[in-house]
C-alpha cells in the first residue's frame, strides 16, 4: 500500500442544462452557441430543422430555434419536440415571428418568441429566466 492520503470527492455531479439550438444563419448560430456555452449550458447546434429533428431522440432542457429555416421550420421542430418531450422549454428567435405565426401555425403552449435583431446578452438572460421557471 502506498502512503498516499485518501481523497474523497464530496461534490455532487451536476449535469449542465442541455440546449438544442437550430439556426440556419452560420454566424448567428456560432455566436449563440458560444454565448450559451460561456453561460454554462451544453449546446448542440444544428443548421436547419431537419438536423434538429434528428436530435430529438436525446433529452433536452430547452429547444432554441429560428422559425424560418430550410427543411422543417422551427414551429414543426417545436411541435415534434413537444410531442416527444412534454414539458420541454421552447424558445423561438426569429426575424419573421409575426409572419410565421400569423400564417396559421401555432407554437406549442408556453413557447417564448424573441424577435431579431436581439443582443446576445438578452438571449442568454431570457434563456436563464426560462430555465429557472
Residue spans for each PLM region:
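Conserved acidic carboxylate
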Residues: 23
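Charged docking surfaces used in two-component/phosphorelay signaling
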Residues: 30-38
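Acidic, metal-coordinating helix/loop segments flanking the phosphotransfer/catalytic sites
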Residues: 45-62
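Acidic catalytic/metal-coordinating carboxylates
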Residues: 48, 73-77
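Active-site residues of response regulator receiver
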Residues: 66
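Receiver (REC) domain active-site loop signature in two-component systems and cognate sites
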Residues: 69-70
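C-terminal output helix
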Residues: 118-128
Amino acid at each position: 500500500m502506498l502512503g498516499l492520503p485518501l481523497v474523497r470527492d464530496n461534490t455532487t455531479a451536476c449535469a449542465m442544462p442541455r440546449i438544442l439550438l437550430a439556426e440556419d444563419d452560420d454566424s448567428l448560430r456560432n455566436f449563440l452557441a458560444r454565448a450559451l456555452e460561456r453561460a454554462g449550458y451544453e449546446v448542440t447546434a444544428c443548421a436547419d430543422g431537419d438536423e434538429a429533428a434528428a436530435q430529438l431522440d436525446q433529452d433536452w432542457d430547452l429547444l432554441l430555434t429560428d422559425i424560418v429555416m430550410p427543411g422543417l421550420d422551427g414551429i414543426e421542430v417545436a411541435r415534434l419536440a413537444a410531442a416527444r418531450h412534454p414539458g420541454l422549454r421552447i424558445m423561438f428567435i426569429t426575424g419573421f415571428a409575426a409572419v410565421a405565426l400569423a400564417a396559421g401555425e401555432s407554437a406549442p403552449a408556453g413557447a417564448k418568441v424573441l424577435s431579431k435583431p436581439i443582443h446576445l446578452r438578452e438571449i442568454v438572460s431570457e434563456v436563464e429566466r426560462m430555465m429557472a421557471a
